[in-house]
Amino acid sequence: MNDHQKNHATSQDDNTKSTPSKNSKHIKIKLWHFILVILGIILLTSIITVVSTILISHQKSGLNKEQRANLKKIEYVYQTLNKDYYKKQSSDKLTQSAIDGMVKELKDPYSEYMTAEETKQFNEGVSGDFVGIGAEMQKKNEQISVTSPMKDSPAEKAGIQPKDIVTQVNHHSVVGKPLDQVVKMVRGKKGTYVTLTIKRGSQEKDIKIKRDTIHVKSVEYEKKGNVGVLTINKFQSNTSGELKSAIIKAHKQGIRHIILDLRNNPGGLLDEAVKMANIFIDKGNTVVQLEKGKDKEELKTSNQALKQAKDMKVSILVNEGSASASEVFTGAMKDYHKAKVYGSKTFGKGIVQTTREFSDGSLIKYTEMKWLTPDGHYIHGKGIRPDVSISTPKYQSLNVIPDNKTYHQGEKDKNVKTMKIGLKALGYPIDNETNIFDEQLESAIKTFQQDNNLKVNGNFDKKTNDKFTEKLVEKANKKDTVLNDLLNKLK
């Protein structure tokens, strides 16, 4: 699963209504794309998750005649293989395989069965520090992909981006492997390294990342001139309380315009998203709609909006790593015209899941319902489009250049364009973005090699490629161009 997965239920005194379920459940948002948080992040994921706190007994009630016959067939096969197969079989493995098969048939990347060990791993780290690389992952179509790297995490610093596909861990293929197994491969001791082979576009590249301890802060506040920037990293217990305190502090400092930075926020607890919306939206208004077939429920605000928040203009900054609970909050603020949304289109996670635990500690997680914004927008697979688009600089979204090939002057290759864009961003004289390796590029590479104590030959070889990537990541981490663009727009 992931190094830090938020699977704790919301507290009973939360203002969030329960989901339309007969069981005692608590609503929680989870992105279920398991966070590679090897450095720590945590699958704080962000699909809305409904957590069941009851243990499941062996019940056959509610089944029709055909379903009872099917269940009887399954029991017969289980008993036959357990008793008569010529080699001794593990009862637990037979059971797990049967359940895995049923869940796999759903063809739903967010539904799965977890063993007791996997469930324990899933539930661990509800709070505190974690060791990992800080990248949230999910499995879809047999591929492991990154949902979002955690802010300031080793993964982000190494250049991992949302939607990167992880094909290998330490040069071992992870294609088709269970997500929890991949996470185990990525996790390790603090200070050790893990190499991820990532595919971005059509290119693959190895990225070496140093594992570290991560402590995830829910809300961070920074005064930028006459604007307050509040970075919300995830929706966890008391995130709304932390945000309230930060807004009150900003108000006392004379701040009347705040930016809520939700970039790469994978989600978390749904009730916290509702409470956070309640800071800006008055009592009795719908924040999110839940639908399961014909059954519908609306989660509404229960208090008046925060007085200090009413005095402020609000801008929300999002990107493709903003998911689930982030989208619930953003969707509500957008529908009620409480904020202007900037950045790029969000991830698009609009489904609700339920987890039910068995008496042996194992667990099944399955998609149960979907959610919609107050105005009825279903964003699953679509995301939320910002009111004002702020593009990420070209050099921050370049495809990786394979490091198993050396490029020379005269070659024609799409990766040559990537070299030119990157070197231009680093300040080297490039006046075209063609895919032809020309004299100007060779000259720029020679200067780059000289500046970085590399062998000066004008060829784009592995060592040059590695340093090229390192410098681009360093530049991206040093200057937040998207936030700066937004701050300039607000002047």
Curated annotation (Swiss-Prot):
Residues at the active site: 324, 335, 349
Membrane topology: Single-pass membrane protein
Record flagged with keyword Thylakoid: no
Membrane among keywords: yes
A GO molecular-function annotation: serine-type peptidase activity
Annotated transmembrane regions: 31-51
Uppermost EC category: hydrolase
Ranges of Polar residues composition bias in the record: 8-22
EC id: 3.4.21.-
Keyword vocabulary terms for this entry: Cell membrane, Hydrolase, Membrane, Protease, Serine protease, Transmembrane, Transmembrane helix
GO biological process, one term: signal transduction
A GO CC term attached to the entry: plasma membrane
PDZ domain sequence ranges: 119-201
One Pfam match: CtpB_N-like
InterPro entries xrefs: ClpP/crotonase-like_dom_sf, CtpA/B_N, PDZ, PDZ_6, PDZ_sf, Peptidase_S41A, Peptidoglycan-bd-like, PGBD-like_sf
Family: Belongs to the peptidase S41A family.
Protein name: Probable CtpA-like serine protease
